[in-house]
A protein has these predicted regions:
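Non-catalytic DNA-binding core/recognition domains of DNA-processing enzymes
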Residues: 18-92
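Short intrinsically disordered terminal tails
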Residues: 94-96
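Short terminal alpha-helical segments
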Residues: 1-23
Length: 96
């Protein structure tokens, strides 16, 4: 599913590589999701089912905001875009 998430990000205009050739956002967000899964000791399916809970947990008022805001809020942003991706997967809306 993370490969599909990466493809979704690329389709939405996120870059795979930066100008200097290093991996960019389309690689980073799936990586951040995998780090959250490992840190929480949950499966991707569990994260998907409880995405709102984890958005709140890693969000500005959540217990794990110090992690959520790391690297220009990459963990929190990855969760936000993962939720949008899941909505597209579920309902087929390209405008999610």
């Amino acid at each position: 599913m993370l490969n599909k998430f990466q493809a979704y990000l690329v389709e939405r205009g996120f870059k795979e590589f930066s100008i200097n050739g290093s991996r960019s956002t389309a690689w980073d967000y799936p990586y951040r999701i995998s780090k959250i899964i490992a840190a929480e000791g949950i499966s991707l399916e569990k994260l998907s089912a409880d995405i709102t809970k984890y958005l709140e947990l890693y969000g500005p008022k959540g217990e794990k905001w110090t992690t959520g805001r790391r690297s220009h809020h990459s963990y929190f942003q990855a969760l936000r875009h993962f939720r949008k991706f899941m909505l597209v997967q579920r309902f087929g809306s390209a405008n999610a």
